[in-house]
Amino acid sequence: MPWRAERRQMYDRVVDVPRLVSFHDLTVDEPPHPAVARLRRRLNDIYAGELGEPFTTVGLCCYRDGSDSVAWHGDTIGRSSSEDTMVAIVSLGATRTFALRPRGGGRSLRLPQAHGDLLVMGGSCQRTWEHAVPKTSAPTGPRVSMQFRPRDVR
């Protein structure tokens, strides 16, 4: 897998992103692994009718251990800021918590995501909820998250 370490602007400084990433536009790029192509086909078979379009991109995150994480956020770049969209997330490897909370505050949901689990966020979820993969102090192995999205949704 062609993993990259990234740095991002966070308020007044640039920080290391606490996970490795790899992004692929599957309308242009070859899938990074044959399993990605198979999963995309299967997810499109199941969800493209409801979504009204196919999944065209895959973003991969590698959480190397419990110190790797993603902060609370909503996927609001592109169309998901104003339209109902769908993201299908497949987890591989160690179990990690996927947390959801209503945007603007409220009680959060904590969903353990184990090897092979599929989590689908659809409808207005990206606009009305935030999600995170919090750090954990419990010993944990690596986890890979594959996020399949339609065009112009990040």
Task: Describe the role of every protein-language-model region.
Residues 1-154:
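Non-heme Fe(II) oxygenase metal-center motifs and adjacent flexible, charged/small-residue loops
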